[in-house]
Amino acid sequence: MCPQKLTISWFAIVLLVSPLMAMWELEKDVYVVEVDWTPDAPGETVNLTCDTPEEDDITWTSDQRHGVIGSGKTLTITVKEFLDAGQYTCHKGGETLSHSHLLLHKKENGIWSTEILKNFKNKTFLKCEAPNYSGRFTCSWLVQRNMDLKFNIKSSSSSPDSRAVTCGMASLSAEKVTLDQRDYEKYSVSCQEDVTCPTAEETLPIELALEARQQNKYENYSTSFFIRDIIKPDPPKNLQMKPLKNSQVEVSWEYPDSWSTPHSYFSLKFFVRIQRKKEKMKETEEGCNQKGAFLVEKTSTEVQCKGGNVCVQAQDRYYNSSCSKWACVPCRVRS
């Protein structure tokens, strides 16, 4: 039985929804300007105030334009294109006083832009997977160009009963992903639910938001899920082959070390098939029971195997989870 959740992490009450204004602060000295990207839109009026007690002889520059662009403690600009974004700096007598960095968040025909990330085949931008029910999971996303990118992923629910999650720093994976004959870079991040109870029924989903920055562009993406819906076990381990009569062999395996315990409660089922020579095993998202595979609910079975490999993959026994990758062992039967 799991202890009752008595405390609420500050991370659970972060409100990601933008205030009802054209400009809001993302972090210190960095602001997001929400811009209507339709051609006839007038742009957004933004006031920038120099952080100084000084009042006179203040000038402004922008890293997007040459020379002095304004004077006075407050600079009023119209933001309607990326040339209007970037860093604005106020000066006095050759001394830098303060600066503000503007990022653009584009909206066209009522839809926020989603240009930084590439969606996966199932039309989602964020793909999350958990190897067990511990509350630990990994989320990944794809980008076409790895240039001047920054990411921040966090809990997006404002409910006091929400499931608090802490995520690490996003990192670039060595894995390249090919979609529609184009190669994409893959980023991933590890997350952990702050308070977990693997045996409890999930009633509220985990809600996450990813903030993405590329040069002077800002976008955000969201996802929600139950841990049970993103389960993908690791492959079975320690596959062993025992020759029997003729071409018959007994293949055995063990649960992956990462899988939840006790196994009597968190049970796996397995799919077994023969991999012929030069045949490639396909990993599918839709289900485990591929053509030629058969179901095994224990950790051994007998098969006829005269060449190639015996391959095994795992799936949650009681819930239609994703399948593990295949684990294979050569037949190596005696002639």
Swiss-Prot record:
GO function term, MF aspect, one: protein heterodimerization activity
Ranges of residues in domain Ig-like C2-type: 23-106
Disulfide bonds: C50-C90
GO biological process entries: cell migration; cell population proliferation; cell surface receptor signaling pathway; cell surface receptor signaling pathway via JAK-STAT; cellular response to lipopolysaccharide; cellular response to type II interferon; defense response to Gram-negative bacterium; defense response to protozoan
Cellular location(s): Secreted
Glycosylation sites: N47, N122, N132, N220
Outcome after substituting M169T: In strain: B10.S/J and SJL/J
GO CC annotations, alphabetized: cell surface; cytoplasm; endoplasmic reticulum lumen; endosome lumen; extracellular region; extracellular space; Golgi lumen; interleukin-12 complex
The entry's keywords: Cytokine, Disulfide bond, Glycoprotein, Immunoglobulin domain, Secreted, Signal
Pfam families: IL12p40_C
Signal peptide feature range: 1-22
Family: Belongs to the IL-12B family.
UniProt function note: Cytokine that can act as a growth factor for activated T and NK cells, enhance the lytic activity of NK/lymphokine-activated killer cells, and stimulate the production of IFN-gamma by resting PBMC.
PANTHER family per record: INTERLEUKIN-12 SUBUNIT BETA (PTHR48485:SF4), INTERLEUKIN-12 SUBUNIT BETA-RELATED (PTHR48485)
Protein name: Interleukin-12 subunit beta
Organism in which the protein naturally occurs: Mus musculus (Mouse)
Gene: Il12b
